[in-house]
Amino acid sequence: MMSVSGRAAAQPIEMLIAKGIVFTIVGTCMLIGAALCAQSTREFMRTSVVVPGRVVKLNAGPHHPEIAFTTLAGEHVEYPQGGDVSVEDGATVEVRYAPDAPEMTARLNTFGAIWGDALTIGGMGAVFFVGGVGQLWSGVRMWRSGRKRT
């Protein structure tokens, strides 16, 4: 039978291992998501076209501009850009979009606007994965050192 102090010591080790497993699984899922996002972005880069556009207003500072452009088919599109960019009001910019869905796919033709999502998810996934493996490794080492050897 395990003593009270033995039970108290076992719980943190079990918790450390459990947290390590959860963080490793979450990190793995995020890394898979980042890989899928990167593949989607590569396909977008292959099939999209680039046209000139203009910043018509800043919604919440320079990182959230409203962009207007005209597609190659002559359609006028205006869309809000996400936060991985920094531009000034009235600036001329390049816009990249998929011809079959310009309003849904438009984004500035900059590294951050195009690859920011995949890199953010990948970076977070790597941190979760490494942190989880570290906790798992630490918990397993503590568990092994606490076992009685026969």
Feature map (PLM): residue ranges:
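Short aromatic-glycine-enriched beta-strand elements
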Residues: G61-I67
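Short acidic, glycine-rich loop/turn motifs
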Residues: F69-A73, Y97
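Structural detector for short beta-strands of small beta-barrel domains
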Residues: T47-N59
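Alpha-helical transmembrane spans
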Residues: M2-M45, N109-T150
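Beta-strand secondary-structure signal
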Residues: P52-R54, E66, T92-R96
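Extended, hydrophilic extramembrane loops/domains of integral membrane proteins
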Residues: Y79-N109
